Amino acid sequence: MEVMSVIPYVIEQTGRGERSYDIYSRLLKDRIIFVGTPVESQMANSIVAQLLLLDSQNPEQEIQMYINCPGGEVYAGLAIYDTMRYIKAPVSTICVGMAMSMGSVLLMAGDKGKRMALPNSRIMIHQGSAGFRGNTPDLEVQAKEVLKLRDTLVDIYHKHTDLPQEKLLRDMERDYFMSPEEALKYGLIDQVIDQTRENRGGEE
């Protein structure tokens, strides 16, 4: 049985009456982008468009990107990554739940000092998948492209973590899972957010 996703709507009072927003459009008004699905072309186009819109509105004001992403297509993820690095507006990234594979690339693409994770989130790196399909004659061409993409991802992780490329290659041979604290030591994030209700001074 297929489960239908339900997108909540928010109703706001304006000078012209009531206005209805889907929850993601309402968050976008506050310069919040939510990455909560696997990375693929249509989703990447939407995220890129949101980044470009917010940058055009105010290139000085921070954009917050919340990430709960199981990973996905490398090409689509790199489109988002390059846009995050291209725009002038600073981007903070917050992992809620998980940032796996290309999700971890987006997490570490935030501005230095603004890459965060909630205490029970999980981060995972690996070589990634190009999603190739084809006939036997294409295998050699595809294999070369897979190696090219692997080298590209290693270069990106190296740029943001300063870890030796040899270590990154070893770690990325298999799924490499990390807690937020381990991701902090690894250099993927800058801060583990521990400001939950329990340690905000006993707020009810």
From Swiss-Prot:
Alphabetical list of Pfam families matching this protein: CLP_protease
Catalytic residues identified in the record: 101 (nucleophile), 126
N-terminal signal peptide: none
Subcellular localization, as worded in the UniProt entry: Cytoplasm
Broad class of enzyme this protein falls into: hydrolase
Enzyme Commission number(s): 3.4.21.92
Entry keywords, A to Z: Cytoplasm, Hydrolase, Protease, Serine protease
GO BP terms: protein quality control for misfolded or incompletely synthesized proteins
Listed PANTHER family: ATP-DEPENDENT CLP PROTEASE PROTEOLYTIC SUBUNIT (PTHR10381:SF70)
Protein name as annotated: ATP-dependent Clp protease proteolytic subunit
Lineage: Bacteria, Thermotogati, Deinococcota, Deinococci, Deinococcales
Gene it is expressed from: clpP
